[in-house]
């Protein structure tokens, strides 16, 4: 389904039915389609402190479905201790576009990387520098961990509304994943319908750059699709979905009024994409001895103690010249 764009006081609102203002003075929702999946990269390696837009000329970004999905379960509360625990990597995003400044959410998952939605990065129109990130933002006057400017964008190769954003270090040469501890990703082996979850981000119907948490339950789970019964609004795009262990199980994208909100579920395909593109991303089971991806697992082919590793001097492979028993 495609959204209709209606002009309201020189601002644009994307919705399937009616134009709805969704924030302080002039915040609106924007929809967009996924573009190509190729990385967009700039040449800069160090950034200036990003300019922070304030006031009412901010427009929340939301997916092509609907901007505001307030369900009967509207259990939303503000997080004021934003630098504590799993809240710290939750990030306020601004995208400076020709049509205005748009707001969204994301979550830091690596030394210099963050996850958000494809439709959020589409608002940059190919210019990564247009996207600014403020991890742990408290309000529009309080950014305890400063701001960072994007330098590269990589979109998920599948259908899911997911994108990776890489950032330049700040003026102190600190990376975004050094000023906050990156979030832990769930392996989702035990994730199922009816489990309690939270979605944490920066909704556009609340004061600018304030973090809010919504509580609810998973109602549907299949492939990369996850649905839940909690409420969100424009600006929540890219918010992390946490399980009860405070691990990220998905990335919120939007919803359908009176029905559900939804996220890209981190299933095996998504997990493989993330591991291929984010070297230091951490999944909850990575440290388990039996995890084949754990470098200390003796069965991991990259483990130097694995008898089948060609670099192991005890490997009887004929090609290992360091093994005296090799033919």
From Swiss-Prot:
InterPro entries: Glutamyl_endopeptidase, Peptidase_S1_PA, Peptidase_S1_PA_chymotrypsin, Peptidase_S1B, Peptidase_S1B_tx, V8_his_AS, V8_ser_AS
Coiled-coil segments on the chain, per record: none
Enzyme Commission number, as recorded: 3.4.21.19
Major localization class: secreted
One annotated GO biological process: proteolysis
A Pfam family the protein falls into: Trypsin_2
Gene Ontology molecular functions: serine-type endopeptidase activity
Enzyme class: hydrolase
UniProt cross-references to Gene3D superfamilies, sorted A to Z: Trypsin-like serine proteases (2.40.10.10)
SS bond list: none
Reaction catalyzed: Preferential cleavage: Glu-|-Xaa, Asp-|-Xaa
Bias kind Low complexity: ranges: 40-54, 286-327
Site (Cleavage): 68-69
Subcellular location: Secreted
Posttranslational modification: Proteolytically cleaved by aureolysin (aur). This cleavage leads to the activation of SspA.
Region: Disordered, residue numbers: 33-61, 283-327
The Sequence repeat ranges on this chain: 289-291, 292-294, 295-297, 298-300, 301-303, 304-306, 307-309, 310-312, 313-315
Gene Ontology cellular-component annotations: extracellular region
Physiological role: Preferentially cleaves peptide bonds on the carboxyl-terminal side of aspartate and glutamate. Along with other extracellular proteases it is involved in colonization and infection of human tissues. Required for proteolytic maturation of thiol protease SspB and inactivation of SspC, an inhibitor of SspB. It is the most important protease for degradation of fibronectin-binding protein (FnBP) and surface protein A, which are involved in adherence to host cells. May also protect bacteria against host defense mechanism by cleaving the immunoglobulin classes IgG, IgA and IgM.
Comment field (misc): The cascade of activation of extracellular proteases proceeds from the metalloprotease aureolysin (aur), through SspA to SspB.
Protein known as: Glutamyl endopeptidase
Higher taxonomy: Bacteria, Bacillati, Bacillota, Bacilli, Bacillales
Gene designation: sspA
């Amino acid at each position: 389904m495609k959204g209709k764009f209606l002009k309201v006081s020189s601002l644009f609102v994307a919705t399937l039915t009616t134009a709805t203002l969704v924030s302080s003075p002039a915040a609106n929702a924007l929809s967009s389609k996924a573009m190509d999946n190729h990385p967009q990269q700039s040449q800069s390696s160090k950034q200036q402190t990003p300019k922070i837009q304030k006031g009412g000329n901010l427009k929340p970004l939301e997916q092509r479905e609907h901007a505001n999905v307030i369900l009967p379960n509207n259990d939303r509360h503000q997080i004021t201790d934003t630098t504590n625990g799993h809240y710290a990597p939750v990030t306020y995003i601004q995208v400076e576009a020709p049509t205005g400044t748009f707001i969204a959410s994301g979550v830091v998952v690596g030394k210099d990387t963050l996850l958000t939605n494809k439709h959020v990065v589409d608002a940059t129109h190919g210019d990564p520098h247009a996207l600014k990130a403020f991890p742990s933002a408290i309000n529009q006057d309080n950014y305890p961990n400063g701001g960072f400017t994007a330098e590269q964008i990589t979109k998920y190769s599948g259908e899911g509304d997911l994108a990776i954003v890489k950032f330049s270090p700040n003026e102190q040469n600190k990376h975004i994943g050094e000023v906050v501890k990156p979030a832990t990703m769930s392996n989702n082996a035990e994730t199922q319908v009816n489990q309690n979850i939270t979605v944490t981000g920066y909704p556009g119907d609340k004061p600018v750059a304030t973090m809010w948490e919504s509580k609810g339950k998973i109602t549907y789970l299949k492939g990369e699709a996850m649905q839940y019964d909690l409420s969100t609004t424009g600006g929540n795009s890219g918010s992390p979905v946490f399980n009860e262990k405070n691990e990220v199980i998905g990335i919120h994208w939007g919803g359908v009024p009176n029905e559900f909100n939804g996220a890209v579920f981190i299933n095996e395909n998504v997990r493989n994409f993330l591991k291929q593109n984010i070297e230091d991303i951490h999944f909850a089971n990575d440290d388990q001895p039996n995890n084949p991806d754990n470098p200390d697992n003796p069965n991991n082919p990259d483990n130097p103690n694995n008898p089948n590793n060609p670099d192991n001097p005890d490997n009887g492979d004929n090609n290992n010249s360091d093994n005296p028993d090799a033919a």
